[in-house]
């Protein structure tokens, strides 16, 4: 019973990390599209927005790294 509880908690931790990775991937995809559009149109305002919005991607990356390190530390033998 305890093993199942531990496995369920581990699965939840992995699912939370995966959800953040998927969210970050969506933000990266949007940034690439907007960046390409800004380049093509030589739109400096849009390019500046892409650079500014990169902070959200960086923040998610930091959270993902922290979560992954925590899961590894907790689950390591």
Role assignments for model-derived ranges:
Residues 1-77:
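Cytosolic, long alpha-helical scaffolding segments
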């Amino acid at each position: 019973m305890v093993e199942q509880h531990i496995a369920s908690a581990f699965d939840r931790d992995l699912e939370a990390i995966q959800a953040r990775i998927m969210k970050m991937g969506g933000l990266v995809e949007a940034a690439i599209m907007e960046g390409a559009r800004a380049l093509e149109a030589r739109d400096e305002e849009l390019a500046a927005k892409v650079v500014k919005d990169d902070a959200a991607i960086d923040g998610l990356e930091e959270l993902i790294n922290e979560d992954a390190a925590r899961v590894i530390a907790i689950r390591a033998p």
